[in-house]
Amino acid sequence: MPETPQLKSVTLRTLQQMKSAGEKIACLTCYDASFTRVLEAAGVDMFIIGDSLGMVLKGHETTVPVTMADMIYHGANVARVGQHALRVVDMPYMSYANPEQALGNAARLIAEGGADMVKLEGGQDKADIVRHLVSHDIPVCGHIGLLPQSIEELGGYHVQGRDEAGARALLADAQALEAAGATLLVMECIPAELAALITSSVSMPTIGIGAGPDCDGQVLVLYDMLGITPGRLPRFVRNFLQDTDTVSYTHLRAHETVRSISYA
């Protein structure tokens, strides 16, 4: 069995240094204290306490019903025992409709939910909100491509940015978010070539989910990785548990795989 990676405290500066060095960032969603301990022991660099919990924990069809109370509760679960991995907490649907509302809710996610930074969905249309949060010392992670909170508007779970106009718009989104002060970017379900272009065009680290191997890091939904999500999984998801004996060894395998870029 591989040795457990040496634990270290991960900060935004750490992630920036990893990008500069070409070292891949290992990220998973996490929602509770027990998995936090196991994942940190496996050397995961960052957690996204995602509104995906609405689907994998609460049984909803989308992330839309997730509330601020949900995000604070699960963020605090992770923060209570987390010591090393950077914690990114999602801002749920309609919690950042305007800059002042976003500021109040983001402050709660940090103060009550233990977030190191908050994540919100959208691109150029959210630049003013990002700028407002950053001006109040709240670190922001952007999220472009497939936006689960806008799934009805997007017409389902489909790859975004396939055509030239869509690709240009996503590149402009990434650049606008960085200009507004975002320091991390999640890119979901976009073509690998586009993700590589965006990654090389911005200085902030990029985290891909279904966005090819050339992002600065990869993230998967924990329950997808363990193969316990019902229904059909996205094609980019690999079940790491099926070939291992324990959950902790599964996480070590996933960590090593992200480092070697053998899935994405």
Predicted features and spans:
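Conserved small/polar residues in nucleotide/adenosyl-binding loops
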Residues: 250-257
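Alpha/beta enzyme core
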Residues: 12, 27, 31-60, 64, ...
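Catalytic cores of large soluble enzymes that bind and process phosphate-bearing ligands
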Residues: 7, 63-70, 239, 243-246
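A hydrophobic, small-residue-rich beta->alpha segment in the mid-to-C-terminal subdomain
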Residues: 229-249
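Short, solvent-exposed beta-strand edge segments and adjacent coil->beta transition regions
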Residues: 23-25, 115, 237
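N-terminal amphipathic alpha-helix/helix-capping segment at the start of soluble metabolic enzymes
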Residues: 1-27
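Short clusters of hydrophobic/aromatic residues that line enzyme substrate/ligand-binding pockets
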Residues: 15, 159, 240
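Hydrophobic alpha-helical segments, chiefly the membrane-spanning helices
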Residues: 262-264
